[in-house]
């Protein structure tokens, strides 16, 4: 049960789907769920959200990526949950790499701790979530520098990205009626009490639920686990998506809060060739330790751990 700290009870809502990555599954299910009457509206929203990386202007790269999706090769998609507040450029406080292999119908969900100490191209060593605002300030683009940083850190190719404004995530949860999760430990934050066990969250509660880390004995790793749980639960529920009356509202929210380099063709290809991986997800954590450097706390990851992550994801992608 979730309650206000003054013990005011909140009514539970029905369990409905909403993916933290927003666009990918919701749009695919809208298209596949028989509501073709709004296909043009879906297309318009996808056009609004479509924001290619600067490197996508290279026709050879575009040809390579298009061929990769067409031939059902494994792909890596970087999810960026960006927390934008007044006077803030935004930071990618949620970074999750989805590695999807359609040949085995398997998916790896790798959570990247936001305080991971890495080399950010053009900036030097810093927290990995600072790549996003640095990219904006440097004029190369927040998603662009985030993708480049993840690629160079783990020596893995990122084929697509999805960026979600976390405030839009809150609106989306409300639009579809809430999400149900299993809370591993009771805690209070943001004016809410989150009981241990199965709880149903509205948008604001869900945002507070995935943001908390200071009360979690596992810190960022516990926070990442809650984020993954919200995503997995929503993806599983999305298979029975039926809120057609909410479709227009959800599309508006997506158009205002999501950007991605996935166009309509790639989204339809994901629906056709990649959707089966939703039922076989392996979660991965990055092991490391906290260390204070020049008065700032960082999450230090060894070269051996970086190599392990690379090896597991590369092996997963090469499976037939």
From Swiss-Prot:
Q: State the similarity comment.
A: Belongs to the LytR/CpsA/Psr (LCP) family.
Give the principal location in a single coarse category.
membrane
Q: Which UniProt keywords apply?
A: Cell membrane, Cell wall biogenesis/degradation, Membrane, Signal-anchor, Transferase, Transmembrane, Transmembrane helix
Membrane topology designation = Single-pass type II membrane protein
Q: Which residues lie on this side of the membrane: Extracellular?
A: 37-320
What is the role of this chain?
A: May catalyze the final step in cell wall teichoic acid biosynthesis, the transfer of the anionic cell wall polymers (APs) from their lipid-linked precursor to the cell wall peptidoglycan (PG).
Where are the membrane-spanning stretches?
Answer: 16-36
Q: What is its EC number?
A: 2.7.8.-
The UniProt entry, under PANTHER family, shows: POLYISOPRENYL-TEICHOIC ACID--PEPTIDOGLYCAN TEICHOIC ACID TRANSFERASE TAGU
**Under the GO molecular function aspect, what terms does this record hold?**
phosphotransferase activity, for other substituted phosphate groups
A GO CC term assigned to this protein in UniProt: plasma membrane
Respond yes or no to whether keyword Cell wall biogenesis/degradation is given for this record: yes
Cytoplasmic topological domain ranges are 1-15
For this protein, the record's HAMAP family field holds:
TagU_transferase (MF_01140)
Q: What is the species of this protein? A: Oceanobacillus iheyensis (strain DSM 14371 / CIP 107618 / JCM 11309 / KCTC 3954 / HTE831)
Pathway connected to this protein: Cell wall biogenesis
Q: What is this protein called?
A: Polyisoprenyl-teichoic acid--peptidoglycan teichoic acid transferase TagU
Segment forming the signal sequence: none
Location in the cell: Cell membrane
* GO BP of this protein: cell wall assembly
Q: Which InterPro entries match?
A: LytR/CpsA/Psr_CW_biosynth, LytR_CpsA_psr, TagU
């Amino acid at each position: 049960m979730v309650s206000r700290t003054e013990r005011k009870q909140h009514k539970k809502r029905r369990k409905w789907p909403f993916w933290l990555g927003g666009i990918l599954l919701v749009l695919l299910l809208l298209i596949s769920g028989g509501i073709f009457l709004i296909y043009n509206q879906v297309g318009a929203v996808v056009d609004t959200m479509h924001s290619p990386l600067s490197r996508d202007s290279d026709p050879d790269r575009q040809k390579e990526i298009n061929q990769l999706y067409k031939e059902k090769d494994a792909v890596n998609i970087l999810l960026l949950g960006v927390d934008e507040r007044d006077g803030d450029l935004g930071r990618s406080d949620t970074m999750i790499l989805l590695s999807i292999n359609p040949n085995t119908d398997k998916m790896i969900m790798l959570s990247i701790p936001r305080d991971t100490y890495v080399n950010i191209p053009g900036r030097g060593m810093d927290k990995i979530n600072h790549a996003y605002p640095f990219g904006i300030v440097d004029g190369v683009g927040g998603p662009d520098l985030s993708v480049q940083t993840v690629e160079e850190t783990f020596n893995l190719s990122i084929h697509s990205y999805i960026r979600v404004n976390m405030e839009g995530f809150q609106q989306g949860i409300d639009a579809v009626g809430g999400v149900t999760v299993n809370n591993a430990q009771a805690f209070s934050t943001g004016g809410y009490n989150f009981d241990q066990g199965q709880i149903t969250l509205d948008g604001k509660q869900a945002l507070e639920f995935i943001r908390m880390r200071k009360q979690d004995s596992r810190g960022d790793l516990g926070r990442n686990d809650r984020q993954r749980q919200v995503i997995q639960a929503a993806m599983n529920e999305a298979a029975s998506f039926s809120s057609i009356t909410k479709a227009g509202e959800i599309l508006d929210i997506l158009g205002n809060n999501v950007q991605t380099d996935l166009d309509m063709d790639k989204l339809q290809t994901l629906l056709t060739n990649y959707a089966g991986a939703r039922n076989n997800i392996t979660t991965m954590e990055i092991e490391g330790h906290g260390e204070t450097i020049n008065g700032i706390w960082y999450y230090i990851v060894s070269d051996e751990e970086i190599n392990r992550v690379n090896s597991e994801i590369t092996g997963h992608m090469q499976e037939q």
